[in-house]
Curated annotation (Swiss-Prot):
The gene is ade2. One of its GO terms (biological process) is adenine catabolic process. Disulfide bonds: none annotated. InterPro entries: Adenine_deam (IPR006679), Adenine_deam_C (IPR026912), Amidohydro-rel (IPR006680), Metal-dep_hydrolase_composite (IPR011059), Metal_Hydrolase (IPR032466). Belongs to the metallo-dependent hydrolases superfamily. Adenine deaminase family. Keywords: Hydrolase, Manganese. Pfam families: Adenine_deam_C, Amidohydro_1. Its cofactor is Mn(2+). The keyword Transport does not apply. This is Adenine deaminase 2. It catalyses: adenine + H2O + H(+) = hypoxanthine + NH4(+). It is an enzyme of class 3 (hydrolase).
Length: 595
């Protein structure tokens, strides 16, 4: 497989650079930068030793005995700190943080994250190929290394939902020709791959032909299905469901991306890995989705490593997974190791438990110090991303299910995340279905202008009692306008607030908007600062806590954003109706029988 690379601004194979580095390593020329007084974590052996490090341009020229050299243009005092390679986030979506790539880079670099593998499928689902091109251009000049992947499942479940675009194998192949694209992003249409669907087979084969990564999303796959998924050419997974699932997929040979957004499973994962007595070379780390308040308060991949250590993983294991193992997966021998001849991506941490970064170096340049950015970050014009929510105002009647008769039997979607089909009987009043006691409503309206925008309505059980409504255009993965609630009036109110804002999140209760976060860029992100976005998102959380009673780990706020992910097994509400990828069934209306 080819090395996975963006178009690096500094070529390590430049003969002049190598000649300068060799001369400096011999002692015949000074270093550009010399880091002294620190201790070095060897990501391969896990050992910590005292060492000084000499840099020439973007290259590590020397790792040598402490105080044995003093000749350098700039000397950095690392006393008391521990030096590691820059952290590598193996799977993430910038859009989940609801800020621009430039703002995201400014957030994670001060935490020691120097490389991320970004699947821009949220932009792809809304803006199509132009959205992916915008993401590539936005990432190109940032001091954060962003390796983009070609979104493989746009939409996630063809025929069951309608997104803003449709990426077939020809579109994927076009993206893969870009040096900025490192492979095929998480293949979520598992059933299509396993069943040999021509569309999905062609997409995976495009990735294989490119020699680049083919990444997976193998939630719930076992036995013959897992073997078939891997036999098609998929080589990784971040959708682990238990410690037993982790053990099985490690044994199967998948590269594992331990996912920080599944915090309730991390301790179980640590116990499994500790039981092995060693860290497999195929274990890496990822954030996947980090909300803006979490990013602002805690950071990115450093927080995943920090929690793993808190749950009992050896710090050197967590950092190896986040550096050397990740670089090996990417076939990037220049990354993931502090050694002569490698790329100068370095982090100086205060210690190996709290992992607070004192200094961050990327390509031999100081980009952040003591939690603040020092490198310039140039944002890209966001004008191409506006006006993506193409819906007229909605009314209360749009959030009711019409029916004639006295009573009705309806289909329901039971419980968050691991959904199941259910049924309920209820009455019909004034020509509309009365929501069954204890249920909530979910409505999805197509917002991309490719079909009518009348919401399709479903009924949720196991979601608790709703005392208001929540509307979002962040709704994986087609990102149609999605509304939850127990009252049609509040649902219409929240929906219209979001439509007026051009996309975003809104909470309504008792006929009034309680909180709103406008996301006018693709209905996914804002060009506001992370600080302001985090504050507004926190207000949304607080408002949501007042209208619904959560029950972790599955009935949680985050579940609202994945309730329409139709590629996952079981029934999910989409803009087409209640869809089940396992059977291919779509119910345009939840009404099954009228009495």
């Amino acid at each position: 497989m080819n090395a996975i690379a963006r178009q690096e601004p500094f070529d390590l194979n430049d003969p002049a650079l190598r000649a300068r580095a060799v001369a400096a390593a011999r002692g015949d020329a000074p270093f550009d930068m010399l880091i002294t007084g620190g201790r070095l974590l060897d990501a391969v052996t896990g050992l910590i030793r005292e060492a000084d490090i000499g840099l020439v341009g973007a290259l590590i020229a020397s790792v040598h005995a402490p105080a044995s050299r003093t000749d350098a243009v700039e000397i950095i005092d690392a006393t008391g700190g521990i030096l590691t390679p820059g952290l590598i986030d193996m799977h993430m979506h910038v859009e989940s943080s609801m800020v621009t790539p430039a703002e995201y880079a400014s957030a994670v670099l001060p935490h020691g994250v120097t490389t991320v593998v970004w699947d821009p499928h949220e932009f792809g689902n809304v803006q199509g190929l132009d959205g992916v091109r915008w993401a590539i251009e936005a990432a190109r000049t940032l001091p954060l290394r962003m390796i983009l992947l070609a979104p493989s499942c746009v939409p996630s479940a063809p025929g069951l939902e309608l997104a803003g675009a449709d990426f077939d194998a020809a579109v994927i192949a076009e993206m893969l020709r870009s040096p900025a694209v490192g492979g095929v992003a998480e293949v979520m249409n598992m059933r299509g791959v396993i069943d040999g669907d021509p569309r999905m087979s062609a997409i995976v084969n495009s990735g294989l032909a490119s020699g680049k990564l083919v990444c997976g999303h193998a939630r719930g796959l076992t036995g013959a299905d897992l073997n078939a998924f891997m036999a098609a050419g998929v080589t990784s997974d971040h959708e682990l469901t238990s410690g037993a699932d982790l053990a099985a997929k490690l044994s199967a040979g998948l590269t594992i991306e331990l996912r920080g957004s599944h915090d309730h499973l991390l301790q179980e994962f640590v116990e499994v890995l500790n039981g092995l007595g060693h860290l497999p070379a195929t274990v890496t780390l990822c954030t996947d989705d980090v909300f803006p308040d979490e990013l602002y308060q805690s950071g990115g991949l450093d927080e995943v490593a920090r929690r793993l250590v808190r749950y009992g993983m050896k710090p050197e294991w967590a950092l190896r997974a986040a550096t050397f193992n990740a670089a090996q997966r990417l076939k990037r021998s220049d990354l993931g190791l502090v050694a002569s001849g490698r790329r100068a991506d370095l982090v100086l941490f205060e210690d190996l438990t709290e992992l607070r970064a004192r200094l961050v170096i990327s390509d031999g340049r100081i980009v952040a110090r003591n939690g603040s950015m020092e490198a310039a970050v140039q944002p890209l014009d966001t004008a191409p991303l506006i006006n993506s929510t193409k819906l007229p105002p909605l009314t209360e009647s749009d959030f009711r299910v019409p029916a004639k008769g006295a009573r009705v039997r309806i289909a329901t979607i039971d419980r968050p995340r691991f959904t199941q089909w259910g049924e309920a009987e209820t009455e019909i009043r004034d020509g509309f279905v009365v929501p069954p006691a204890g249920s909530a409503m979910i409505a999805v309206a197509h917002r991309h202008g490719k079909a009518g925008g009348t919401p399709r309505i479903g009924f949720l059980t196991g979601w608790g009692e709703w005392r208001g409504a929540f509307c979002t255009t962040v709704s994986h993965d087609s990102h149609n306008l999605t509304v939850f609630g127990g009252d049609a009036r509040d649902m219409a109110l929240a929906a219209n607030a979001v439509i007026k804002a051009g996309g975003g999140l809104a909470v309504a209760k008792d006929g009034a908007i309680q909180a709103i976060l406008p996301l006018p860029l693709s209905g996914l992100v804002t060009d506001a600062s992370l600080k302001d976005t985090a504050s507004a998102f926190s207000d949304i959380r607080k408002a949501m806590d007042k209208i619904v009673d959560w029950k972790p780990p599955y009935r949680v706020f985050k579940a609202c954003f994945g309730a329409t992910l139709a590629c996952n097994a079981g029934p999910h509400q989409t803009d087409r109706g209640i869809a089940d990828v396992t059977t291919g069934k779509v119910l345009e209306s939840p009404v099954l029988e009228i009495f």
